Amino acid sequence: MNLVLMGLPGAGKGTQAGKIVEAYGIPHISTGDMFRAAIKEGTPLGLQAKQYMDRGDLVPDEVTIGIVRERLSKEDCQHGFLLDGFPRTVAQAEALETLLSEIGRKLDYVIHIDVRQEVLMERLTGRRICRNCGATYHLVFHPPAKPGVCDKCGGDLYQRPDDNEATVANRLEVNMKQMKPLLDFYEQKGYLRHINGEQEMEKVFADICEVLGGLAR
């Protein structure tokens, strides 16, 4: 089975990706992992990507697509894959369609884990970290026994600047603007399946399995 997994920050994409690859025996392929592997292996495309990344520039689509092609040609992808973090744009999605066609493959589904912005805000702004030992808490989902105090060492809990409301709201807005055209593209192609990501973790996974039920494991 050939899948793309989509969702905004805080939607639980990483958790569900882990469950999918374990249940269906396909590799979880993230953009970052692909780049790191290509750079480590010293492939020509990996070295090109490294030059851009070292300068803090975006890696051009042609290099990214080339690295995706190399990754999908590996033995562990013969029975399927789960792409996460790619494609990010309609141009990349179109290039992926072409690439898959050239190697005799096609996407089965694009799974979108759908969570309302206010729920994402609660999830992302609730994180608190111990200044002393680094333990992580969440005001709603994993609160400390005593507000503002670490259960483990008694240290002071704080909110990272990246987790404040203004920063999180901006991050979600940027991601949504980027993702919307991609969702529309895959909707028109008939690949897109929306999953309610506001449910319990196991129910989200059960709904994903229901979508994938017609595909061979």
From Swiss-Prot:
It catalyses: AMP + ATP = 2 ADP. Its main location: cytoplasm. It is found in: Cytoplasm. It holds the Pfam family ADK. Its EC number is 2.7.4.3. Pathway: Purine metabolism; AMP biosynthesis via salvage pathway; AMP from ADP: step 1/1. Zn(2+) binds at C130, C133, C150, C153. Keywords: ATP-binding, Cytoplasm, Kinase, Metal-binding, Nucleotide biosynthesis, Nucleotide-binding, Transferase, Zinc. ATP binds at G10, A11, G12, K13, G14, T15, R127, T136, Y137, Q199. Consists of three domains, a large central CORE domain and two small peripheral domains, NMPbind and LID, which undergo movements during catalysis. The LID domain closes over the site of phosphoryl transfer upon ATP binding. Assembling and dissambling the active center during each catalytic cycle provides an effective means to prevent ATP hydrolysis. Some bacteria have evolved a zinc-coordinating structure that stabilizes the LID domain. This is Adenylate kinase. It comes from Geobacillus kaustophilus (strain HTA426). The gene is adk.
